[in-house]
Swiss-Prot record:
Any one annotated GO CC term: membrane raft
Family stated for the protein in its record: Belongs to the flotillin-like FloA family.
Membrane topology reported for the UniProt record: Single-pass membrane protein
Cross-referenced NCBIfam families: PRK13665.1
Residues passing through the membrane, by range: 7-27
Record's function text: Found in functional membrane microdomains (FMM) that may be equivalent to eukaryotic membrane rafts. FMMs are highly dynamic and increase in number as cells age. Flotillins are thought to be important factors in membrane fluidity.
Coiled coil: none
Name of the protein described by the UniProt record: Flotillin-like protein FloA
Gene designation: floA
The entry's keywords: Cell membrane, Membrane, Transmembrane, Transmembrane helix
Keyword Transmembrane: yes
Organism for this UniProt entry: Finegoldia magna (strain ATCC 29328 / DSM 20472 / WAL 2508)
Compartment annotation: Cell membrane; Membrane raft
Main location as per UniProt: membrane
Length: 327
């Protein structure tokens, strides 16, 4: 029994040391102390327990302290737990200090948590950024298409980074201004001769209102002549009118054919009535003979007249046929 206790003491010491070094990054603590950042070991243990990686807080804090910024571990840890990028935040604060831009920690943290790249915003505030628009097609009043490509120089407005519109809005507004300016030009030649008029007109519209940027200049990079939209529209209209006329003509033809068929049916109906009436003639003659209204002599005289008429018709028909054959 007395031999077991001394044997367990070294094991317990080793276990305690392992637990201590797993909870406390001693190397990071030593680095912080020599860098002028006074961090307690209890603070590092608390970070471990809160599942915060100590180096993600201490290293940016060392950088900020060396740059002359007055930050605390609580500020950085709170920003880290909120989902922010501590390293980018500290770099942005250092860059703003060097560029003599007023940027407080709370403002920078809010910008970072809003999803903006606060470091890029500070850099664009110092060094303006050039946004290149895609090819923008606009049509002048004479119907000629003009294709314009512009370069917009912007500077970030840190005060409007939260809630301000981004680059897409700038590009859309510039494109709208170009289309409006070209559309109000009487001809495409005036646009080609003086492209600066586009940039001046668009720049005076205050397109950066409500955005996170301040437009410094709008430069026309390229101007090309596109299609003749006016002529194309006239051609399309003529083709449409032609198809409408053809459709109306086809409708009239169909109505004429239908009318012709109606007339043919009407003629056939009248012929049927004539045949029906002719079929009643012998019956009427028989009734007249039976009733005494028509004599036998009168009947034969009528037959002779009918035969004579048929003979004359046959003779006239043959003579007309002979004349046609002679021709």
């Amino acid at each position: 029994m007395p031999f077991e206790i001394p044997f367990l003491v070294p094991i317990l010491i080793v276990i305690l040391l392992l637990v201590f070094f797993s909870l406390v990054p001693v190397g990071l603590w030593v680095t912080a102390q020599f860098s002028g950042v006074h961090v307690k070991i209890s603070q590092l243990i608390g970070m471990r327990l809160r599942r915060v990686i100590p180096k993600n807080i201490i290293n940016p804090l060392i950088k900020a302290t060396k740059a002359g910024l007055n930050l605390t571990t609580n500020q950085l840890e709170a920003h880290y737990l909120a989902g922010g990028n501590v390293n980018t935040l500290v770099n942005a604060l250092i860059a703003a200090q060097r560029a003599d831009i007023e940027l407080e920690f709370e403002r920078a943290a809010a910008i970072d948590l809003a999803g903006r790249n606060v470091l890029e915003a500070v850099q664009v505030s110092v060094n303006p950024k050039v946004i290149e628009t895609p090819n923008i097609a606009a049509v002048a009043m004479n119907g000629i298409e003009v294709i314009v490509k512009a370069k917009v120089t912007v500077r970030a407005n840190i005060e409007r980074l939260i809630g301000g519109a981004g680059e897409e809005t700038i590009i859309a507004r510039v494109g709208e201004g170009i289309v409006t300016t070209v559309g109000s030009s009487e001809s495409h030649t005036s646009v080609l001769e003086n492209p600066d008029s586009i940039s001046k007109t668009v720049l005076n519209k205050g397109l950066d209102s409500g955005t996170a940027f301040e437009i410094l200049s709008i430069d026309i990079a390229d101007v090309d002549v596109g299609r003749n939209i006016g002529a194309k529209l006239q051609t399309d209209q003529a083709e449409a009118d032609k198809r409408i006329a053809q459709a109306k003509a086809e409708e009239r033809r169909a109505m004429a054919v239908a009318k012709e068929q109606e007339m043919i049916a009407e003629v056939r109906s009248m012929r049927a009535k004539v045949v029906e009436s002719e079929s009643k003639v012998p019956l009427a003659i028989a009734k007249a003979l039976e009733s005494g209204n028509l004599g036998v002599l009168d009947y034969y005289n009528m037959k002779n007249i009918i035969s004579d008429t048929e003979m004359r018709q046959a003779i006239s028909g043959n003579s007309e046929k002979i004349k046609e054959d002679d021709k």
